[in-house]
């Protein structure tokens, strides 16, 4: 039985109880949301040590951190450190997007290193195995694709991106609809190229029922990938993106009938004024499936600062219904991120998520209230306790010290200090 099947039968699972307690909501409310497919629970049946996480309606906006090797840089220990740092700074989930080295070993080591849910893109492994054999990616067979997917599910991944919306029909449209950036999804591109080469339908779409069987066996959440997401602002909201979205919406409904949990991935580059409409359209087209967005980035001309562009877009997306933010690092569009890039990316995404969560959950807002109270009292010890990034708090305080009880920005000119002293003097006089 999957979490969705249990929920439909009125069963509150251990995972639902655990999550409801952490989220501060009633177990039965969570059960109803899971039954409808409005909320998903990450917890592969064989991933025994994972702490389950819920994404979707009625729960907090979550943050994912992507890590993984590339064909140029293969350092397994660094990837494990990235995973640990990401979790330390609040990542709710990790995606291993490795494309270089022993992918099975890397994935399994990352899964053992942390206790948060793990996601992958299995088609990457199918493609990498072709290259390792000296073959072209388009030479992979349908069996190669299915073997990679089943291997990841058996290993215990809790969610997996599958580009089921890259169909033969939409690939044909690509021949007449010109984009500025083109197609930027790796997994989506692998499948589009395969379709063009063999003139056959995407196996993951053609045999979607088989994909559902595999996902159901392990209770893996299918993250329906946006292979045709816009890779730059000029391509946002074009016919290709929207055509894929409506295909994904139909596939969500089929998955729900089969008792399989799904979420839908969203755009990566969107002008700031279009974000509310795009997220709301996603919710309508998918019957309120959980929405997973990469950013979205609100500008393209700040390489090195894309984590900030992504946090701005992520906050707006979450405010308008996005449920799951995939972080963006300062290395986006430039190279493979290092550990520090991962830390900065997670913090930026957590900031965006918290900005929305504090509007919906009293305990989240309480943190900000307590910080305001501590600042109003110049209580630095309390501010440190509440601060999200305590290391940065200490670093700046030590770098620019002051002899006053204020900070080195104002010192004796501190507005809070002056008015407190004057009010106290007035009351005692």
Swiss-Prot record:
Chain sites annotated for binding Zn(2+): 269, 333
UniProt-recorded Gene Ontology molecular function terms: 4 iron, 4 sulfur cluster binding; carbon-carbon lyase activity; zinc ion binding
Residues noted as binding [4Fe-4S] cluster in the record, renumbered to the chain: 407, 410, 414
Catalytic activity: 5-amino-1-(5-phospho-beta-D-ribosyl)imidazole + S-adenosyl-L-methionine = 4-amino-2-methyl-5-(phosphooxymethyl)pyrimidine + CO + 5'-deoxyadenosine + formate + L-methionine + 3 H(+)
Keyword 4Fe-4S found: yes
Keyword vocabulary terms for this entry: 4Fe-4S, Iron, Iron-sulfur, Lyase, Metal-binding, S-adenosyl-L-methionine, Thiamine biosynthesis, Zinc
Ligand binding (substrate): 66, 95, 124, 163, 185-187, 226-229, 265, 292
EC number: 4.1.99.17
Pathway assignment: Cofactor biosynthesis; thiamine diphosphate biosynthesis
Obligatory cofactor(s): [4Fe-4S] cluster
Pfam families: ThiC_Rad_SAM (PF01964)
Superkingdom: Archaea
Enzyme class, UniProt record, top EC level: lyase
GO-annotated biological processes: thiamine biosynthetic process; thiamine diphosphate biosynthetic process
Cofactor note: Binds 1 [4Fe-4S] cluster per subunit. The cluster is coordinated with 3 cysteines and an exchangeable S-adenosyl-L-methionine.
Family: Belongs to the ThiC family.
Known role: Catalyzes the synthesis of the hydroxymethylpyrimidine phosphate (HMP-P) moiety of thiamine from aminoimidazole ribotide (AIR) in a radical S-adenosyl-L-methionine (SAM)-dependent reaction.
Alphabetical list of NCBIfam families matching this protein: PRK13352.1, thiC
Protein name: Phosphomethylpyrimidine synthase
Organism (species): Pyrococcus abyssi (strain GE5 / Orsay)
Gene from which this protein is expressed: thiC
């Amino acid at each position: 039985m999957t979490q969705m099947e249990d929920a439909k039968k009125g069963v509150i699972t251990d995972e639902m109880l655990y999550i409801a307690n952490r989220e501060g909501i009633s177990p039965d409310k969570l059960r109803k949301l899971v039954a409808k497919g409005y909320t998903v629970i990450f917890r592969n049946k064989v991933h025994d040590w994972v702490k389950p996480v819920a994404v979707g309606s009625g729960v907090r906006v979550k943050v994912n951190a992507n890590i993984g090797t590339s064909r140029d840089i293969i350092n397994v220990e660094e990837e494990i450190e990235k995973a640990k740092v990401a979790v330390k700074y609040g990542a709710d989930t990790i995606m291993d997007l490795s494309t270089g080295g022993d992918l099975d070993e890397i994935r399994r080591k990352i899964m053992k290193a942390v206790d948060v849910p793990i996601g992958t893109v299995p088609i990457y492994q199918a493609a990498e195995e072709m290259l390792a054999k000296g073959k072209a990616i388009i030479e992979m067979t349908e069996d190669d694709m299915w073997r990679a997917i089943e291997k990841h599910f058996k290993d215990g991944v809790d969610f997996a991106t599958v580009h089921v919306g890259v169909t033969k029909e939409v690939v044909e449209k690509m021949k007449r609809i010109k984009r500025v950036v083109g197609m930027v999804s790796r997994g989506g591109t692998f499948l589009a190229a395969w379709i063009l080469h063999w003139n056959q339908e995407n196996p993951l779409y053609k045999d979607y029922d088989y994909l559902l069987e595999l996902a159901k066996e392990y209770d893996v959440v299918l993250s329906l990938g946006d292979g045709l997401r816009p890779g730059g602002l000029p391509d946002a909201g074009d016919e290709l993106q929207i055509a894929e979205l409506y295909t994904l919406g139909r596939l969500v409904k089929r998955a729900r009938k089969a008792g399989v949990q799904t979420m839908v991935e969203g755009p990566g580059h969107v002008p700031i004024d279009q974000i509310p409409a795009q997220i709301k359209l996603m919710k309508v087209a998918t019957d309120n499936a959980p929405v997973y967005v990469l950013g979205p980035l609100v500008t393209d001309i700040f390489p090195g600062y894309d984590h900030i562009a992504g946090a701005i877009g992520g906050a707006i997306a979450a405010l308008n219904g996005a449920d799951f933010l995939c972080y963006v690092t300062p290395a986006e569009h430039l190279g493979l991120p290092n550990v520090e890039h991962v830390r900065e990316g997670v913090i930026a995404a957590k900031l965006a998520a918290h900005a929305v969560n504090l509007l919906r959950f009293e305990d989240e807002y309480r943190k900000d209230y307590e910080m305001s109270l501590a600042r109003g009292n110049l209580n630095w010890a309390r501010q440190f306790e509440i601060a999200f990034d305590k290391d940065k708090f200490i670093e700046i305080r030590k770098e620019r010290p002051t002899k006053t009880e204020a900070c080195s920005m104002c010192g004796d000119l501190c507005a809070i200090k002056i008015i407190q002293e004057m009010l106290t003097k007035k009351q005692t006089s």
